[in-house]
Amino acid sequence: MKQGIHPDYHLVVFEDSATGYKFISGSTATSKETVEWEDGNEYPLVRVEVTSDSHPFYTGKQKFTQADGAVDKFNKKYGFK
């Protein structure tokens, strides 16, 4: 691997802004904020808006909407059932 061209890969704590859930993962993301993790070490803190803890797909609160298709629109427009 060529030296000096790859981003710095390190452990980072991600915090879900909506729920406050925190998890640690390897990343190239950086931040000036730091937080002390459960192991006693200090890691950069990256705040994110959506994680698996708050996304509707993962929480089971996903809602599906019924979109009218072209045939339904035609039938509605011309009064067919």
Curated annotation (Swiss-Prot):
UniProt xrefs under NCBIfam families: L31, PRK01678.1
GO-annotated molecular function: structural constituent of ribosome
Protein name from the UniProt record: Large ribosomal subunit protein bL31B
Keyword Lipoprotein tagged: no
Entry keywords, A to Z: Ribonucleoprotein, Ribosomal protein
Protein's gene: rpmE2
HAMAP family: Ribosomal_bL31_2
Subunit annotation: Part of the 50S ribosomal subunit.
